[in-house]
Amino acid sequence: MNQEVMNLFNQQAQPQSFDQIKISISSPEKILSWSYGEIKKPETINYRTFKPERDGLFCARIFGPIKDYECLCGKYKRMKYKGVICEKCGVEVTLARVRRDRMGHIELAAPVAHIWFLKSLPSRIGLLLDMALKDLERILYFESYVVIEPGLTPLKERQLLSEEEYLRAQEEYGEDSFTAMIGAEAIRRILQDLNLEKIAADLRQEIATTTSDLKPKKLLKRLKIIEAFQLSGNKPEWMILTVVPVIPPDLRPLVPLDGGRFATSDLNDLYRRVINRNNRLKRLIELRAPDIIIRNEKRMLQEAVDALFDNGRRGRVITGANKRPLKSLADMLKGKQGRFRQNLLGKRVDYSGRSVIVVGPELKLHQCGLPKKMALELFKPFIYARLDAKGFSATVKQAKKLVEKEKPEVWDILDEVIREHPVMLNRAPTLHRLGIQAFEPKLIEGKAIQLHPLVCAAFNADFDGDQMAVHVPLSLEAQLEARVLMMSTNNILHPANGAPIIVPSQDIVLGLYYLSIVADGAPGEYKSNNPLNPMQGVYGDFGELEHALASRAVTLHSKVKWRWKGLGPDGEEVTRTYDTTPGRVILSSVLPRHPKVPFDVVNKLMTKKEISAMIDTVYRHCGQKESVIFCDRIMGLGFSHAFKAGISFGKDDMVVPENKWTIVDETRALVKDYEQQYQDGLITQGEKYNKVVDAWAKCSDRLASEMMNRISSVQKDEKGADKQVNSIYMMSHSGARGSPAQMKQLAAMRGLMAKPSGEIIESPIISNFKEGLDVLEYFNSTHGARKGLADTALKTANSGYLTRRLVDVAQDAVIREVDCGTDAGIRMRAIIDAGQVVATLATRILGRATAEDLVAQDGSIIVPKGQMIEERHLDAINKAGIQEVKIRSVLVCATKNGVCATCYGRDLARGTPVNQGEAVGVIAAQSIGEPGTQLTMRTFHIGGAAQIADSSFIESSFEGTVRIRNRGLARNSDGDLIAIGRNVAVVIVGPDGTERAVHRLQYGARVRVDEGDSIKRGQRIAEWDPYTRPILTEVDGIVAYEDLIDGQSITETTDESTGIAKRVVIDWRGSARTADLRPALAIHDQNGKVLKLPRGSDARALLPVEAIIGVDPGARVKAGDILARVSTESAKTRDITGGLPRVAELFEARRPKDAAIIAEKSGTISFGRDYKNKRRLSLTPHDGSEPVEYLIPKGKHIHLQDGDVVEVGDFIVDGNPAPHDILAIKGVEELAAYLVNEIQEVYRLQGVSINDKHIEVIVRQMLQKVEITDSGDSEILTGDQIDRTELQEINEQLVSEGKKPVQGVPVLLGITKASLQTRSFISAASFQETTRVLTEAAVNGKVDTLEGLKENVIVGSLIPAGTGAMIADIKSIARRRDELIMAQKTAESGAALQELPAAE
C-alpha cells in the first residue's frame, strides 16, 4: 500500500542521465508511435467556454487535461480517479503537465517533401537521386512529370516531361506503356526504388577509374550520402512526409489577453494552415474533383508544410495579421533568439541582483560592500532556515513576516548568514574569466555596491555609473569553488600573459610616484662634507624618521642615508646603508621581509611599470597571501600620499616650446621644396604626398620631444633647491593618466589627422589645445574624430563575434593527462624585427617544458628534457648564449580529445604547472578575444610616416664581426656597395663565434659594411629607398632597349603640372599586335652582343608595366647601377590590413587579396611565353622532378630574372603568403610560427601582451582535420577529410591487423569552418547554420558523445572540465569496470551452459 502511495507522488519523471544523443530521420511509424491521437480540426478553443475543441489543436482527449486530476466535463475530479479515462469527454485524469510532452499528428492526404532535405544546401534528395534542385522543385510543385518506368518506350528513366509532352507521349505510346508521376508521390516512389548497395558499388568503381580533377569530388559527395543512409539505418523515402507530428500544446500556448483577444504562438497559425489545406484536399479527393484543382491543392499543402518547418526557405515568407513573418520550427532553433543560444547556453539566474558600483578604498582585497537591503533579499532562504533553527519562528510564514518587518534579530541573523559566505560579482561585458570574481560581502548602508579599487582593472570597471550584478552560490560545493577558485585573492595574475593584474592605477600610482621623487637641495638632506652637523640626514630607525618628517626637519624627497635591516640571501639578518629618500623608506616599510625582496626594489622612481614589477617580485618569492596583504597596504599608502601631495593641473603646466615656430617654418619650407620638386617632375604625386606627410610627422615628433624636455626638466628656486616637478609630467611619466601623445596635443601641436577613409590629410593641425584651433583646423580634427566614434561601435560588435568564434572552436581543448610522452617539439628563438629585439627568447620560453635537454657550452644540462623552464633558469640560458630552444607545444601534443599538461606548460594565472581538467581552450579564446576591443579597425594605407620610416634601413642590435652570405654585391658608379643578389644576407657573429643575427638584404640596398668588419650596436648595416623598387644591372656594359616601341610599350609622359618628360613602360598586352613584345633593357659589350651573367643567362632585365626608365640607350653603366625604378606607390597603395580585421583574416585562414606566390621546390626560374594577360614563369626543381608553372597577373612586379635560383618557400611574387601554402610547402611548424608571429604583431602594435601558447591552442584546433592521400587497406576514400584522432584510431586497428595504414596530410580550416566540423553536432548546431548542421547530422544518424563543454551545458550536465573532469574520469573508469565484469559474467554463464548437458 505504502509503495502505491509513494508511486502516486513520484509522478514527476526523474531526470534521466545519458552518455550520448543520437539524431536521425523519423519514419512515419515512429511519428505515429509518439502521437496520442490525430488532429482533424483546425479549431483551437471554444470562444465562449474557453475549453479546447475536440480533435482540435488543443484537444484535451489527445494531449491531456487542462487542470490537474480533472477531466474536461468535470465528471471525475481529484487524485483518486488517477488514470481513469472519462467515458463522456474521453480525457484521461492525470497531471496537466503531460500537455508539455504529449504529441499529436496530422495524417496527410498526399505526401509532401521535407523542406530541410530538399532545400538545405547541398540538397540531400538531389544528391541522392543525382538530380538538379531545379528539376526536383518542378516535380514537387507540379510543373513537370517524371518518368519512373519507361517500359518499352524511347523515354528515359527520370526524364522530365511537361504537361504537353506527357499528354503527347500518352497518345503516342499508349497510357499503360510507361509510368510517369508528378509531385511528392513521384519522388517518394523513386526514393523507395533506389538500390543503395548497387549505386555505392558503381560510384566506387567510377571514382577509381575517373581521370578528371573535379569529377571525383562530386562523386565522393554522392557516395558519402549514400553510405550515410546505409550505415545510419535511415530510409531515403522518410525524407518525404506522409504524417506531420504536432508538438505538445503547452509548448505553443494560446494565452487569453484582457479584452477578449488571444496571444498565440505562430506555430498554431502554421499548423492551422496545414490542417485546413489537408482537410480541403481530402474533401476534393472524395468528391473526385478535376486533376488540376487537386494538384493545386496538393501544391498548397506542400507550401503550408514548408512554411511550418522553415518559413521563408522557399518562395514568399508567410506573414501573420500584422505583416510580421511567422516564426517556424526552424526559426525557434536558430540565431541569437533561438532555443540553443537563448535558453540552453545562457539562462537567467535566480538569487541575483544588480546595482551601481562605487569605490570602496577601505575594503580588503577579498571584500566587497553589499547593501543591506540587497543582502536581505538575496539570502532570504538562509535567513528563514536560521530563524527557524534559533526558534524565532515556527513556520516559514512567520519567518517571512519577521523579515518583512526587518526586526532587529533579522539583522543579527543576516550577519551570521553572510559570514564566510562568498558572493560573486560580475560586470558585463564579461570578456574573460576575470569578469566574474568572488568576494566576501561586508554589509553597508546605502544602495550601491562597493568595489575594491585594485580589481577594477580585471573587471575593466570605472565609477562613472557602471553597474554590476551579484550572484549567490547556494550549494556547499558552489561556495567552496567560489572561495578556492574565484576569490579575488586567487586571481592576482592575468591568464593571458601571467603578469599581475592587481596593479595600482591612477591616484595610487601618482601617490607612490610622488612618494619616491628625489629633490636636490631639500631641507635636512645628507651632505658628505657637512662640518656643522655630519649626522644630518642619517637615519637608522623608522620612528626617528617619522618624527623628523612630522617636525618638518626633512621632506619626503630629501636625500638621506638610511640603515636598512633585512634578510640576506641565506635568511640571515643583515644591515646595509643606502642613499635614498624618506618617501622611499616609508614605501619600504610595507615590503614583506624576504631575502629575495631587498630595499633596491623600492629604491627607484616608482612608475606604474616599476610598481607592477615590484608586485610580480613579491608574488613570485613571498607567495599569494603576502602579496595580497602587500597590495592592500600599497593601495592605502598611494591614496594617502596622493591626497597629501595635492597635485593639481593648471594651464601653466602646459609648456609650449619656444622654438615651435622655427621648427614649423623649417618644415613649411621643406614642404614647399617638395611641391617644387613635384612641379619640376622629379617626383610623382604619390611620392610627394609621402614625403610631405613624412616631413610633418618628423616636425610633430621634434616638437613633442622639445616639449617633453622642457616639461621634464626640474626648475630651481632662488636658493638652488628643486622646485616641484611639473604636474602634467608627473601624471604622464608615472603612468597614472595621459600619454606623451596626449601631452603633445595639449602643448606642442595636434599633428596630422586622418580622413574617415583612413588616409592622412596632408596639412596638419599646427596649433595645440592650449593655443586653440582655428576654424579649418577644428573642422579637420572633427573629421577624423567622428570616424573614431563610429569605429568604436563597430569594433565592439566585431570583437565580440571574434571571441565567440574562438570560444566555439576551442571549447573542447581541456587538459586530459599529465604527459602525452611525445618527443616532438617546436623551435623557439627571439623575434627580431628591423634589427630590434621585439620578444626575447627568455620571455617566449618561460613556463614551457623542454623537448630535449637544454645544454650549456660546457656540456652541463641547464634544464633536462620534459622539465619546465622557470625564472631561475633564465640567467643560465642567457649566459650560455643559447639562441634557439626546442620546447613542447600543444601543436605537437599527442593526447586524444584534449591536450596534456606538459605540452601546455605553466598555468599563467597561477604561476604553477597547469592542472588536469583546466579548460585551456576557453582561456586561450578569452585571452585573444578580450583585448579585441583595443585593436584598431582601420586598414592602413602605406604612405603614413610610421609605416615607411621604420622600413628603410637596418641597424645592428649586437656587437660582433660581419660575415656576408651568398655574396652578391657590386660597387656602382658612385662607389657604393649595392646588393645585386636576391639572397644576400649579413650575418653578425659574436665574440664567442655564435651567430647573433642574420639580416636578409633588400635587393638594391646600399650596404654600409663589408666582410670581416667589426660592428657596434646601433651601427647602420644597410639602407634603401622605401618609396621605389630598383631594377639593377649586374654587369658593366652598354644599355640597349629591346621591344621598347614608342606608343606601344613605352611612352614619354609629361607631368601636366611640371612639364617634365619621363619614359614609362605602358601596358603592351592590350592589342593582339603587340601582345608578344617583351620590353626589356639589355646590357651589351663593345660589339653589341648581349653580355652573359655569371650564372649563364643573358644580362637582360624584363620591365614590368609602369616602370620608369632611368637610362638612355647607349649609356655606359656599372654593376649595381639603377636601370629603372618601379614606384611602390604606383604598385597601388597596398592596404595593410591591420588590427582586428587582420586577426580575423588569419584565424579564418582566408587567402589574402594579393597573396604572395611561394616556391614549392628549390630550383631555377625561367620565363615562358606569356599567356593572355598573365606572365608565365616556370620553376625547374633541382631534384629533377616535373617543372612547376606559375601564371602571374601582368601588373605584378616579379623581382626575379631568368636563371635566378630560389629555395623552397622563397617568395616569387611579394605579398602576404596564404597560410594554406605555408602549410603545404613548409609544414605545420612553419605555419604555426607564421600565424603566431603575425597575430602577435597586431597585438604588439597596440601594446597588448598575450602568451604564444594561447594562439598555439587555437591553431591546434584549426589543424584537427586530415585529408586522405592514400586510403591504404581501409574503406575510407582518397580526398576525404576526417578527424586527426579518428585517423589515429583507424590506423592503430589496421596496423594491429597487419594491413596497410591510411596516409593523410593536415588541412588548415578557418575557425568558423572548424567549429562547424566538430564531431559534436549539438555544439555545431548551436554555433551557426543550425538547419544545415542538423539536416546533415540526421542523414548521417550522428551520435554525440557529449565530450566537449558546450554540448554538456546544453543537455544540462556537469561540464567535463575542472571538478566535472574528475567526475567524468570516475564515470569512465566505472563504465570500463562494468564492461569487464559483464564480459566475465557472460563468459562464466557460457561455460556453465556448456556443462549443463553433461550433468544430465
UniProtKB/Swiss-Prot annotation:
Catalytic activity: RNA(n) + a ribonucleoside 5'-triphosphate = RNA(n+1) + diphosphate
Enzyme Commission numbers on file: 2.7.7.6
Class of this enzyme: transferase
Alphabetical list of HAMAP family matching this protein: RNApol_bact_RpoC
Organism for this UniProt entry: Methylobacterium sp. (strain 4-46)
Keywords: DNA-directed RNA polymerase, Magnesium, Metal-binding, Nucleotidyltransferase, Transcription, Transferase, Zinc
Protein's UniProt keywords contain Translocase: no
Annotated protein name in UniProt: DNA-directed RNA polymerase subunit beta'
Single GO molecular function: DNA-directed RNA polymerase activity
Pfam families attached to this UniProt entry: RNA_pol_Rpb1_1, RNA_pol_Rpb1_2, RNA_pol_Rpb1_3, RNA_pol_Rpb1_4, RNA_pol_Rpb1_5
Sites where the protein binds Zn(2+) 2: C820, C893, C900, C903
Lineage: Bacteria, Pseudomonadati, Pseudomonadota, Alphaproteobacteria, Hyphomicrobiales
GO biological process: one example: DNA-templated transcription
Residue positions binding Zn(2+) 1: C71, C73, C86, C89
Swiss-Prot/TrEMBL cofactor(s): Mg(2+); Zn(2+)
Residues given in the record as Mg(2+) binding sites: D462, D464, D466
Annotated GO CC locations: DNA-directed RNA polymerase complex
